Regions:
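Basic/polar phosphate-binding segments, predominantly the helix-turn-helix DNA-binding elements
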Residues: 184-213, 230, 236-261
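Amphipathic alpha-helical segments enriched in hydrophobic/aromatic residues interleaved with Lys/Arg
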Residues: 100-154, 158
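Cyclic nucleotide-binding regulatory module and flanking cytosolic helices
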Residues: 1-6
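A short, Lys/Arg-enriched amphipathic alpha-helix from helix-turn-helix/homeodomain DNA-binding modules
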Residues: 114-123, 140, 160-182, 189-191, ...
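Short hydrophobic/aromatic patches on the structural cores and recognition surfaces of FHA
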Residues: 43, 59, 198, 221, ...
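Terminal helix-turn-helix DNA-binding modules in bacterial transcription factors
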Residues: 204-243, 263-292
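Basic, amphipathic alpha-helical hairpins
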Residues: 125-135, 148-159, 171-183, 201-202, ...
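N-terminal regulatory/effector-sensing and dimerization cores
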Residues: 7-105
Length: 292
């Protein structure tokens, strides 16, 4: 089993990462932008959306359609929650022949227990992402399709991709350079529209550029805290905050917990004691992205 504390991307194939968490936390409005298979190794995961709750126990998995938003609870077992995820590239999904009887996944497909062969296929797919030198791309893609076959066996298939909303396109832009100031003129130019059109389109989607930039930074901060061992101060710098204390204040404002709570570590205790005030959040903040 791969246990690297980092995010690994293989273009055209997929993304993998492993999450460790030591206390139970409720994280609200977490967006899963891409089709993802989440596997719980230890503890319990709860996904809540639209009045429903999906429970994934240890040894189980959830196949999540892209573009979904959940409230997430990761519940440790004896002090440890461990999970990992596999994001499958859209091109791989597009090339997979879905059996006629299989329906598109609506939000999330719960798989309470993974058969040994399914788990082996999943591990082989993760290994293909982690070690491109050892696994040719054609083989890596085939391993991904085997995982899709197992998901289909459980009655679901990832729906075909749809054109992304403006907000999602902006999140992708911001993620490419989290420290950039991202002014409206530059964003509008990159999206080939006027500033007025940009503001109007974002208003129609119930968000703003300021909210999206902040949310994207917080999303990546959450991911880095969950899947790497980098210090909180380093994470703050990576997502565009020169001041660790201001970062900690913004993080607490968004998630209701200080950064150190994600790992139940004390490294940010001094930061938490010196947090700077930040402006009040919008009433309905844009969703933060993937948290396994």
């Amino acid at each position: 089993m791969l246990t690297d504390r980092r995010v690994i991307l293989r273009n055209g194939v997929g993304v993998i990462a492993r999450v460790l968490q030591r206390r139970e936390l409720l994280l609200t409005r977490i967006a899963v932008d891409q089709p993802t298979l989440m596997v719980v190794r230890r503890g319990l995961k709860l996904l809540r959306a639209a009045g429903t709750e999906t429970v994934i126990p240890a040894g189980g998995a959830a196949a999540i359609a892209g573009g979904e938003v959940f409230d997430v609870v990761n519940r440790p077992d004896s002090g440890i929650y461990a999970a990992d995820f596999l994001v499958i590239d859209q091109a791989v999904i597009a090339g997979f022949a879905v059996p006629d009887a299989v329906r598109p996944i609506a939000r999330a497909l719960a798989i309470p227990a993974m058969a040994p062969d399914f788990l082996e296929a999943y591990e082989r797919a993760r290994a293909a992402v982690a070690d491109p030198a050892a696994v040719p791309e054609t083989v890596a893609v085939q391993r991904m399709r085997e995982v899709l076959g197992w998901i289909a066996h459980h009655g679901g298939a990832f729906p075909p991709p749809v054109p992304p909303a403006i907000a999602q396109r902006i999140r992708v832009l911001v993620a490419g350079d989290l420290a950039a100031p991202w002014r409206a003129a530059e964003v509008a130019s990159q999206l080939a529209m006027s500033e007025a059109t940009l503001r109007r389109r974002l208003a129609a989607e119930g968000t703003s550029l300021t909210d999206l930039v902040t949310e994207t930074r917080m999303a990546h901060a959450l991911m880095l805290l969950q899947v790497t061992d980098q210090p909180v101060a380093t994470v703050a710098a990576l997502v565009g905050y020169d001041s660790p204390s201001r970062f900690a204040a913004r993080f607490r404002q968004r998630f209701g917990h200080p950064p150190g709570a994600i790992r139940d570590q004390t490294e940010s205790a001094a930061i938490r004691d010196q947090t700077e005030p930040v402006p009040a959040p919008a009433p309905n903040p844009a969703p933060t992205r993937l948290s396994a």
